Amino acid sequence: MRRTILMWVVTAFGVLALGGVVVVASQQGWFGSKAQRWLTQADTAMKQHRWPEAQAHLDQLLSTMPDSPLIPSALLKLGEVQEAQQHLVEARAAYQQLLDQFRDSPLTSETQTHLGQVNVALLFSSTQTEMDAVYQVQPGDSLGKIAAINGTTVEFLQKANRMSRDVIRPGQKLKVPKGRFSVVVDKSQNQLLLTQGNQFVKTYHVATGANNSTPVGTFHITTRVPNPPWYSPQGVIPYGDPRNILGTRWMGFDKAGYGIHGSSDPSTIGQQVTAGCVRMNNSDVEELFDIVPMGAEVTVVD
């Protein structure tokens, strides 16, 4: 009789304990239902462009269930919601958090794409971030001089400071980048990485040399030419001629004959097909051209 009572007590205690665990698990969303519901509600709101509502669902998930396996998806969606509202600093923070905390996430590539778009948009905006500094124009300054001092381009200064003309005045304050821009080209991935200081800015798909013809090493930009002519073996082919393979921009290396340029055939991007140069889509090379100054370091790796 005593054994029966003891077994009953133990069983009852076990049931109560299990029940408590189930309740706590349910409250915490361990079974995934609550987290998934918030994520689904956020997704539905996003499709209907109800951004504040979507953000509220995502904030609830992120704040109450930080250990949920759905956190990477929530961070990506939060970044998209902030980006859609032009809250670029907040969008960047969400994307960066995902990349920092979940390095092996299958969402990494998609997140980097979003982060790159936001980073460039911030660079060219009037918004000041920790990656920017303020330069006060001195007597005798020109945009070219200011760009050289601050490791940037005239085009960058014009875009970031909403300048329609080259006219500046002493005492005027201009947004300039903090930290030098540099480039790494990965031949095996046909990918170009743009960094500012040691910080990721953006990756671009590129074409590199056929038969391993793109040289490996560290180079520097020594020429920058918009709308470049092509000095082909058959002679000079002007910009705009369909035979000109350089596209809309040329950034030459301190190794004769090599550089980064645009394309007359976008279908080749992502392949190893060039004579040794790094080829980009025209829209991408135009963007890069406005950021990367003379003297910028370019590292090419296998």
Residue spans for each PLM region:
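Exported/periplasmic cell-wall-interacting domains
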Residues: 237-302
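Primarily a LysM-type cell-wall glycan-binding module
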Residues: 43, 65, 76-81, 85-89, ...
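Intrinsically disordered, low-complexity Ser/Thr-rich linker and spacer segments
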Residues: 100, 113-135, 175-200
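Short alpha-helical segments in extracytoplasmic peptidoglycan/chitin-binding modules
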Residues: 137, 141-159, 171, 192
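Short solvent-exposed coil/turn linkers within tandem alpha-helical repeat scaffolds
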Residues: 62-71, 99-112, 153-155, 159-168
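Gly/Pro-biased beta-strand-loop elements
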Residues: 178-264
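Alpha-helical segment of the N-proximal tetratricopeptide repeat
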Residues: 29-60, 64-67
